[in-house]
């Protein structure tokens, strides 16, 4: 039986970044939906920390809970989200992440923090704000459906008289003097202002709050990254061209019957080894007969960026009524 492929119905800035980084890895991860079955500690820890922040803020701002109760609820939610995952390093263990959450709200105290969630028209605060917009492309596998781009920010907030997207970044590395500069051209922080603009909510840019767990002490750093209208226009133009090119490559590959490397090129450089770990698909790039063994070596899970979760591919296909 041929391995199932599906072009994603929903994409986000991370997927586009990975397509730029290594088209072949993008093909394996998001078109063939290959997975080794192991979720990295970094992803699990980051997701759990974001969940803890969300629950804490909602308890305090939406439910009028006192800070101590709100933070306790956030810690409980973090532990539940982290689950029974066994961390490869103490830096991002469940216990360390709980400590980081508690220290975060000591560093940025509820009720005193000058970055405050914006209030929505329904009276609730914009905590975990999401958007989704249709792109002018028909899905190549499911005719009649559009491709959708989505984004999900930790918070939409008021700061210094303007609206900002807020995003927390956990890292196992120490902060450097150039740490803020990496965000000034990061596509994620163009995607959010662009998507919010489409929703009729203009924002100045993004506030990024780093949480470093490199040493014994947990440290915090905040920076702002502004986006102008011209930057959003360029980002939109290039984003559309990238999606169009990916769709063309995918369609041509399906029609050709050739090996995917004729259409989705490998990076053959730094992407093959990141943070002292090899790409999970490196062995496939080193094997002449890699396509023959995919089903025995990998599971198939589709990443759903709008839900921030993954699902077994066949289960997902059944849920949308797609049987091919």
Language-model segments: which ranges?
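An acidic intrinsically disordered interaction segment
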Residues: 2-23, 147-161, 236-247
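Metal-dependent nuclease catalytic regions and adjoining charged, substrate-binding loops involved
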Residues: 11, 79, 181-183, 193-324
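Short, compositionally biased low-complexity segments
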Residues: 18-28, 48, 64-83, 205-208, ...
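Active-site-adjacent bridging/hinge elements
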Residues: 22-29, 162-169, 249, 255
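A non-catalytic, helix-rich entry segment at domain boundaries
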Residues: 52-137
């Amino acid at each position: 039986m041929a391995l199932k492929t599906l072009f994603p119905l929903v994409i986000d800035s991370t997927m586009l970044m990975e397509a730029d980084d290594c088209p072949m890895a993008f093909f394996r991860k998001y078109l063939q939906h290959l997975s080794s079955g192991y979720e990295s500690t970094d992803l699990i820890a980051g997701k759990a920390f974001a969940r803890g922040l969300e629950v804490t803020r909602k308890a305090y701002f939406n439910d009028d809970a006192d800070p101590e109760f709100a933070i306790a609820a956030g810690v409980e939610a973090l532990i539940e989200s982290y689950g029974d995952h066994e961390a490869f390093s103490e830096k991002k263990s469940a216990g360390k992440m709980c400590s980081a959450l508690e220290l975060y709200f000591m560093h940025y105290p509820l009720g005193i923090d000058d970055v405050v969630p914006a209030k929505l028209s329904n009276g609730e605060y914009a905590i975990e704000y999401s958007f989704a917009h249709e792109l002018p492309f028909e899905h190549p596998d499911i005719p009649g459906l559009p491709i959708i781009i989505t984004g999900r920010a930790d918070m939409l907030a008021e700061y210094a008289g303007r609206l900002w997207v807020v995003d927390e970044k956990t890292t196992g590395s120490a902060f450097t003097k150039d740490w803020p500069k990496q965000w000034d051209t990061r596509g994620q922080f163009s995607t959010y202002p662009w998507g919010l603009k489409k929703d009729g909510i203009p924002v100045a840019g993004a506030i990024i709050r780093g949480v470093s767990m490199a040493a014994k002490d947990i440290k915090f750093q905040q920076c702002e990254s502004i986006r102008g209208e011209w930057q959003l226009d360029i980002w939109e133009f290039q984003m559309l061209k990238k999606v169009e090119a990916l769709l063309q490559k995918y369609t041509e590959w399906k029609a050709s019957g050739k090996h995917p490397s004729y259409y989705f090129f490998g990076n053959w450089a730094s992407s093959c080894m990141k943070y002292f770990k090899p790409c999970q698909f490196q062995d496939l790039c080193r094997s002449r007969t890699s396509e023959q063994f995919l089903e025995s070596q990998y599971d198939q899970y589709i990443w759903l960026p709008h839900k921030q979760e993954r699902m077994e591919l066949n289960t997902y296909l059944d849920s949308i009524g797609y049987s091919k």
